[in-house]
Amino acid sequence: MDSERDANSAASATPVAKTTIARPVSVPRKPASTRPPTKARGNDRAAAVTPQPEPDTREIVLTIEGLVKRFGSTTAVAGIDLTVRAGSIFGIVGPNGAGKTTTLSMVTGLLRPDAGMITVHGADVWGDPTAAKRELGVLPDRLRLFDRLTGAQLLYYSGILRGLSRPTVIARTKDLAIAFGLEDALDRRVTDYSAGMAKKVALAAAMIHSPRLLVLDEPFESVDPVSAANVTDILRRFVETGGTVVLSSHSMELIERICSDVAVVVNGAILDAGTMTEVRQGKTLEKRFLELAGDQTPAGGMEWLHSFSG
């Protein structure tokens, strides 16, 4: 008992430390930054949400699905798929023998495919050729005109065969002659035309019935720069008023300058297609084409050519 009292006395004699409660310290806030947020860098870019392009709601003018054409054991066109929308100038580029002309010949009903389907404004080119060809204006490669006709006669019969009335044909012939600079050439026979003039009168004949889709194979071949600029202006105005153009050309610079969309065709297949910006990927169309089609083969040998020894 005495020991318990002594312990309690000792405990009561020991001073108890007071607990101090710290008051919260007020820290002044920094003003909100007015600087724009920094752009994502490095790996942060992967986390950023890439905005999705808006769906293209323009009317589909031309659809090509699974198009195939063979000549004997050679496959000229190997399953091409392509969609062309209204209001575009769609360029098709490729090396010689790529299948460009063969493809356009099937699109316009001049050559029957071995497989696949082609529709123009919903009309099957081979299932309903009358409806499809009513919408088409065609400038074929290896241009052959009725060279015994004058330019005026060629345009006249082109319009009449398309079902236009005589007064309509005469009025449109006058308009087309002015637009293409052919006023002084209409009374001359087509056989006397230069290659460039023949190309222009053929393009005028392709447009006389006011088609909705122009399919032009090498429209600028043999055409001088002034006439080419004139034709380009006509095609742009045609597109601005609701028309659509599909054309082929070997001139990458020209295709890049005037076309809104492009397809690169090599060995009968499409290697890339889309808007000009999408296909170019920040390069010139020619450089992008060489990447896809393969760079040119270095010219070797032929040392004899530089010997000048006869």
Question: Residue locations for each model-derived region?
Answer:
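Conserved ABC ATPase "signature" region
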Residues: 156, 160, 168-185
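Catalytic Walker B motif of ABC-type/P-loop ATPase nucleotide-binding domains
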Residues: 214-218
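ABC ATPase "signature
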Residues: 273-274
